[in-house]
C-alpha cells in the first residue's frame, strides 16, 4: 500500500500514467460499481498506526462496523479486526451504497476514537480497498485468510485465541470438523502477499 513512497520519481509517474490510462483514480484504490457479489473489504489505519491497540477500542470498532452493515441489510459473511486494519467479506448489490456506509462509518469512528484518545484532528483512516470474490474457492480461501490474519501478523499463535474474528461464529455454526475441512480444502498459502504483509 505504501510502496509509492519508496518509488523513484520516474516509477511514480509511470504508476500515475497507467492508472490514468485505465480510468482509475490517480492516488486511490478504484471501486467498481454495478457488480453484485461478495467483496473482500480491507481498511487500514493511516500509515498502519495501531489506533485500536486497546481491547475495548477494538471491541467497539468491531461492534460499530458490523452493526453499520446489519442496519443497511448488507450481509457480513466474515471479519477480522486488528489494531491497525480490518478485513470484511460482505455481500452487496451496490458498491456505491457500501462505499457510502464505509465513508460515514470511518468519519464517525475517527471522531469518537480521537475524542477517547484526546487526539482531535488526528487522521485515523487511509482508504479502503474492495476486491470482488470471483469463485467459491476464492470465497473460502478469503474467509480462511481472515480467520488466520491475527496469527499471520503475530498477535496470537492460534486463530481461536483472537476474539475479534468471525472464526468463533464459524465454529459455533458449522462445527470444528467442518471448519477444519474448509481449512484443508481452501488453504491460505501466500494469500495477501503484496498487499497485507
Residue ranges of model-derived segments:
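Short catalytic/metal-binding and nucleic-acid-binding patches
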Residues: 1-197
Amino acid at each position: 500500500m505504501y510502496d509509492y513512497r519508496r518509488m523513484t520519481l520516474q516509477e511514480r509517474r509511470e504508476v500515475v500514467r497507467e492508472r490514468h490510462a485505465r480510468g482509475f483514480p490517480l492516488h486511490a484504490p478504484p471501486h467498481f460499481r454495478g457488480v453484485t457479489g461478495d467483496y473482500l473489504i480491507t481498511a487500514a489505519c493511516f500509515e498502519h498506526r495501531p489506533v485500536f491497540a486497546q481491547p475495548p477500542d477494538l471491541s467497539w470498532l468491531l461492534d460499530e462496523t458490523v452493526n453499520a452493515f446489519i442496519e443497511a441489510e448488507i450481509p457480513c459473511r466474515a471479519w477480522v479486526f486488528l489494531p491497525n486494519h480490518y478485513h470484511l467479506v460482505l455481500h452487496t448489490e451496490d458498491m456505491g451504497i457500501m462505499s457510502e456506509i464505509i465513508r460515514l462509518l470511518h468519519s464517525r469512528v475517527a471522531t469518537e476514537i480521537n475524542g477517547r484518545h484526546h487526539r482531535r484532528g488526528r487522521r485515523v483512516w487511509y482508504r479502503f480497498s474492495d476486491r470482488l470474490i470471483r469463485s467459491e474457492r476464492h470465497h473460502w480461501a478469503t474467509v480462511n485468510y481472515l480467520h488466520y490474519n491475527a496469527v499471520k501478523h503475530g498477535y496470537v499463535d492460534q486463530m481461536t485465541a483472537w476474539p475479534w474474528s468471525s472464526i468463533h461464529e464459524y465454529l459455533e455454526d458449522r462445527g470444528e470438523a467442518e471448519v477444519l475441512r474448509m481449512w484443508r480444502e481452501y488453504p491460505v498459502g501466500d494469500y495477501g502477499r503484496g498487499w497485507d504483509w
